[in-house]
Amino acid sequence: MSAPSSPRVTRIAPSPTGDPHVGTAYIGLFNHTLARQSGGRFILRVEDTDRNRYVPDSEKRIFQMMQWLNLTPDESPLQGGPNGPYRQSERFDLYGDYARQLVQSGHAYYAFETSDELAALREEAQKAGHVIAIPSRDLGAAQAQARVDAGEPAVIRLKVDRDGETVVNDLLRDPIHFANKEIDDKVLLKADGFPTYHLANVVDDRLMQVTHVVRAEEWITSTPIHVLLYRAFGWPEPVFAHMPLLRNADKSKISKRKNPTSVEWYQNQGFLPEAMLNFLATMGWTHPDGQEIFDLAEFERVFRLEDVTLGGPVFDLAKLRWYNGKYLREVLSEDDVARRLHAFLMQNKVTLPSVDGPQDPYFRAVTHLMIPRLEVFADFMDKTLYFWSEDYPVNEKAQKAIDAGKELLPELAARLKNLPTFDAASIKEMFHAYAEEKGLKMGKVMPPIRAAVAGTMESPDLPEMLEALGRERVLARVEKAAR
């Protein structure tokens, strides 16, 4: 795909109100890609004006999420940049100035209604079937200014023309028409000087030179307000593109009641950031060549925003696990898997007896055996306990296999003991020779050994597993099971 003719400036603007959300990662991926494709800039702005919902460590965790995903912004509160500050709470003076500028130009007005008066006005408007009418809208400019100068509490509201319509042009949709009579006069600046989302969002996007506003489709209903603000200021509108929301399997909006929504949960489960990005890239978009597995560089090479579809992509955890397993088996080298797996286990304070690092021969042997059977790193210890401890459980199915083949175990133990070399090829050859000699099928010979040494019938290739465990450990377990 040829590079866009002009650099795109994109942004994400999360609010630090809780766990770093998978939806932020999703929107961040597409904004990051659009900027990188064009040699533009990707901005991370923190919208922290809602102090009631503010969570102190949330901002730090958002940065950590973006770093983990390798979606590094060019400008943010961490890096700084030419258009900072990048926290809205540090830009309050700007918003007040711009709100008053709109009052002076006649596109906004001071409003003095109390909360009780507003409640009554809303009830009246609801009964009449129209938007709330604000009496202060009809005050003369001098009269309103005099009340402000006298210290009377006031908000600043957008003055929406009651005639005509406002059209939102969205790159992913046909033009969306909103009747102006159905758009209420939104508060832009609160009485305490705090801006609302609408004012701060538009002012920041303009001052940070954002060219493309790519965000979730839940913001479509706010966009006519933003369009009206751009027009009131005399500023050109950015390109708007509202991405489809991530959905649960029942097509409801993704929520933590049905799917984990915190990216930290996926990190703690041992998902790979590359697999997460690959999966998120397929949410509403398909590779033009039908590829399912591709890296961030390939996504940047072929992605076109116009190709996003709006069908409501399903965030399928089983599919994400499938992607992660594919990366473990087909994309990363075994060295890389071992290194990352060892780091994951150390981070989670898992003790591996006698393992001194990711290159430890025994750890590497176990990793080699388990890669085909892993989807996420968190599964590793549950699936490999018998490699690390003699105190491993024997499940019901395995116990039945031991009981059914108990008379074979002493002879098999003796033959394993007498093998000249204890490697997978020799072990496999011994099993076949024993089965042929006794007139048994391999399905009778191998299960009791597997059950005895692993406590489960779900384990890797048996000869390779026995070689990794070593002769001494295998014989002790088989002899114990035979008693």
Swiss-Prot record:
Enzyme class comes to: ligase
Q: Name one GO biological process term.
A: glutamyl-tRNA aminoacylation
Gene3D superfamilies with a match to the protein in the record: 1.10.10.350, HUPs (3.40.50.620)
What would be an example GO MF term here?
Answer: zinc ion binding
Q: Where in the cell is it found?
A: Cytoplasm
State a GO cellular component annotated for this protein: cytosol
Q: Cite the EC number.
A: 6.1.1.17
InterPro entries named in the record? aa-tRNA-synth_I_cd-bd, aa-tRNA-synth_I_codon-bd_sub2, aa-tRNA-synth_I_CS, aa_tRNA-synth_I_cd-bd_sf, Glu-tRNA-ligase_bac/mito, Glu/Gln-tRNA-synth, Glu/Gln-tRNA-synth_Ib_cat-dom, GluQ/Sye
Q: Where does ATP bind?
A: K256
* Substrates-to-products reaction catalysed: tRNA(Glu) + L-glutamate + ATP = L-glutamyl-tRNA(Glu) + AMP + diphosphate
- Residues forming the motif 'KMSKS' region are 253-257
In chain numbering, motif 'HIGH' region lies across: 14-24
Alphabetized UniProt keyword annotations: Aminoacyl-tRNA synthetase, ATP-binding, Cytoplasm, Ligase, Nucleotide-binding, Protein biosynthesis
Q: Which family does it belong to?
A: Belongs to the class-I aminoacyl-tRNA synthetase family. Glutamate--tRNA ligase type 1 subfamily.
Q: What does this protein do?
A: Catalyzes the attachment of glutamate to tRNA(Glu) in a two-step reaction: glutamate is first activated by ATP to form Glu-AMP and then transferred to the acceptor end of tRNA(Glu).
Query: Quaternary structure?
Result: Monomer.
- Record's protein name: Glutamate--tRNA ligase
Q: Which organism is it from?
A: Deinococcus radiodurans (strain ATCC 13939 / DSM 20539 / JCM 16871 / CCUG 27074 / LMG 4051 / NBRC 15346 / NCIMB 9279 / VKM B-1422 / R1)
